[in-house]
UniProtKB/Swiss-Prot annotation:
GO terms for molecular function: GMP reductase activity. This is GMP reductase. The keyword NADP applies. One of its GO terms (cellular component) is GMP reductase complex. Gene3D superfamilies: Aldolase class I (3.20.20.70). Its EC number is 1.7.1.7. Catalyzes the irreversible NADPH-dependent deamination of GMP to IMP. It functions in the conversion of nucleobase, nucleoside and nucleotide derivatives of G to A nucleotides, and in maintaining the intracellular balance of A and G nucleotides. It comes from Clostridium acetobutylicum (strain ATCC 824 / DSM 792 / JCM 1419 / IAM 19013 / LMG 5710 / NBRC 13948 / NRRL B-527 / VKM B-1787 / 2291 / W). It comes from the Bacteria. Belongs to the IMPDH/GMPR family. GuaC type 2 subfamily. The keyword Oxidoreductase applies. It catalyses: IMP + NH4(+) + NADP(+) = GMP + NADPH + 2 H(+). One of its GO terms (biological process) is purine nucleotide metabolic process. It is an enzyme of class 1 (oxidoreductase). The lineage of its organism: Bacteria, Bacillati, Bacillota, Clostridia, Eubacteriales.
């Protein structure tokens, strides 16, 4: 493959600014039949999203994907969102009971607007079969399939009927797949995104490895329609998970979807737990992300996200921050 790089290795090159104010820049994105205020989605993890956060995001024009780790709540969640006139976006796995759940939704005439097939290694027959099953019983649902890390995987899942693919194998802050297995896109996630997006004919969701707001713009440049983020969305006032105090500072727990803390057992573990500093209200982070992305668009010389997709860039191996950290 071509040159390998990650987020910290890339600097986007500015183009002539055409706006008088960054507030003129539009950060909205279309996914499926809906438009959203930002091309970002909080990771569908237990310490990142719950029913209340999903409701807040949907009511305020943001995309969300509800996690799949409390399957008994999914039916009532879908009904509740639809009763409020909001879109329903859920996750499923590939076990036998998930097939029954999809059939149940069809029988009750409940079609979530978005269904994400959420497993660690998405380039598999089990995912292909689940895509086909959902498309048979819930043909109107927008199916996101993942996670994958190769063009072949993107093509196969699209061919099976996926409406979008999620790219990223273990680059996240609480994912240790690369350490435990030797496989993944950790350390070259941005190059993997570029590689996969060239093969894609449908939207790609970049998942994992986002450490700064600027990484969102870089993901857009290399082919992402939407960017899934875990660590930047962890630790908020509304975030699920335990809050602790240490040395006079507040922290909230954040753990991976394949960690023993989520699984409830120490078996096939590919995730870990950490505590992140308390960040305050979620809405403040969303506003900051929007403002930063508006600035990115202005530097790209346009008024919408499309401007970012065509800017030039340079590869500056591991040196662009020079030790700088904003968090």
């Amino acid at each position: 493959m071509e040159s390998v790089f990650d987020y910290e290795d890339i600097q986007l090159i500015p183009a002539k600014c055409i706006v008088r104010s960054r507030s003129e820049c539009d950060t909205s994105v279309i996914l499926g039949e809906h438009s959203f205020r930002l091309p970002v989605v909080p990771a569908n993890m237990q310490t990142i999203i719950d029913e209340n956060i999903a409701l807040f995001l949907a009511q305020n024009g943001y995309f969300y994907i509800m996690h799949r780790f409390e399957p008994e709540k999914r039916l009532s969640f879908i009904k509740n969102m639809k009763s409020k006139g909001l879109f329903a976006s859920i996750s499923v796995g590939v076990k036998r009971e998930e097939y029954d759940f999809i059939k149940q939704l069809a029988q009750e005439n409940l079609s979530p607007e978005y269904i994400t097939i959420d497993i660690a290694h998405g380039h598999s027959n089990t995912v292909i079969e689940m895509i086909q099953h959902i498309k048979k019983y819930l043909p109107k649902s927008f199916v996101i399939a993942g996670n994958v890390g190769t063009p072949e995987a993107v093509r196969e899942l699209e061919h099976a009927g996926a409406d979008a693919t999620k790219v990223g194998i273990g680059p996240g802050k609480v994912c240790i797949t690369k350490i435990k297995t030797g496989f993944g896109t950790g350390g070259w996630q941005l190059a993997a995104l570029r590689w996969c997006s060239k093969a894609a004919s449908k939207p790609i969701i970049a998942d994992g490895g986002i450490r700064t707001p600027g990484d969102i713009a870089k993901s857009i440049r290399f082919g992402a329609t939407m960017v899934m983020i875990g660590s930047l969305f962890a630790g908020h006032e509304e975030s699920p998970g335990e809050t602790i105090e240490k040395d006079g500072k507040l922290y909230k727990e954040y753990f991976g979807s394949a960690s023993e803390f989520q699984k409830g057992e120490k078996r096939n573990v590919e995730g870990k737990k950490m505590f992140v500093e308390y960040k305050g209200p979620l809405k403040d982070t969303l506003i900051e992300m929007e403002q930063d992305l508006q600035s990115s668009i202005s530097y790209a010389g346009g008024k919408s996200l499309d401007a970012i997709r065509t800017v030039d860039y340079v590869i500056v191996k591991n040196s662009i921050f020079n030790g700088d950290r904003i968090y």
